[in-house]
Amino acid sequence: QAQAMIAAGHAIVVDVRDAPEVEKSGKVSGAVHVSRGMLEFRADPDSPYHDKSFHKDRPVIVYCASGGRSALAGKTLKDLGYTEVYNLGAFKDWVENGGGVDRPIEPGM
């Protein structure tokens, strides 16, 4: 279901891992990187740091390395008023199931 939503472009996909994790392994193709510690600032429309990719009427799919941080992120988003929130779970599971990945840029490029 997540792959279909992502392919259709209906959902925003959010990687809540820390920057070094994303730099090392890449991220789900088309995902927005917002570390778990910054999520409230980026997802709250009243925040001066709001990321305009977040819309409360748009489905949000969150993931992390193992599924723990993304579960917490999902709860946070629901507390902020997002109604369609999905936990994709672990990034490694996405990769192992053939999901698309945007690879990191080589250092120095």
What are these regions (language model features)?
Residues V13-D15:
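Structural scaffold elements adjacent to functional motifs in cytosolic proteins
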Residues Q1-A11, P20-P59, G68-M109:
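Rhodanese-like catalytic fold shared by cysteine-dependent sulfurtransferases
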Residues Y63:
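Short, surface-exposed ligand- or partner-binding patches at beta-edge/loop junctions that are enriched
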